[in-house]
Amino acid sequence: MASREERTEALAKNLHIYVSEAHIFTSDAIVLASFCAPRHKDKCCDLGTGNGIIPLLWHRDFRPKEIVGVELSESAIELLNKTLKENNLEEYIKPVHCDLRALKGILPNEYYDIVSINPPYKKLGTGIVNEGEDYKNARHEFTCTLEWFS
C-alpha cells in the first residue's frame, strides 16, 4: 500500500507504477520510451531511470530481452522495487542503485542495444534550484550532464 506521499498511477489495466511528489513522470518520458522502441531481442538500459517509467513502458509495449534501470536516488529505487514486486515484474526489469559517474565496472561495456537517458533540463547556475536532493538532482545538472556522455 502506498504511503501518504506515494500513490500509484495506472499504465494499463493490470499495470501500475508508484510515484511520489519527488518522483513523477511526464509526457517526455512516454515519448522517449516510444522513440527508442526496442525489439524483442534487444538488451536495454535506462540511465537515471527515476521511478522506472521508461523500463516499465518498454516491458509493457515491446518486451525486450533484457531491461536495466540505473538510478542514483534511493527513494526512487525503492518506488521502482515496490512497483516491480506488486506487478510481478522482478524477473523482467533489473534496478541498479548507482551514481552514473561510478557505473564503469558495474554494467558491461558495449553490451546494450539501446541506452536511454532523460537528463535534467537545467544547467548549473540557471533557474531556481529545487530544495531536497531528489528534486535538485532530477531537475538540475548536479549529478549528470549531457557533456559527460558525448
Which residue ranges define each predicted feature?
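A generic local structural motif
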Residues: 2-4, 18, 82, 102, ...
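Conserved SAM/SAH cofactor-binding pocket of Class I
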Residues: 35-117, 122-128
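SAM-dependent Rossmann-like transferase core, predominantly class I methyltransferases
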Residues: 3-43, 49-61
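General secondary-structure edge motif
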Residues: 12-16, 96, 129
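Mobile active-site "lid"/loop adjacent to the S-adenosyl-L-methionine
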Residues: 119-149
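Short, contiguous clusters of charged residues that form electrostatic/catalytic patches at enzyme active sites
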Residues: 27-34, 78, 98, 144-148
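Residues at secondary-structure transition points
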Residues: 27, 49, 67, 71, ...
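Residue-level signal for pocket-adjacent positions within structured domains
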Residues: 6, 12, 95, 135-137
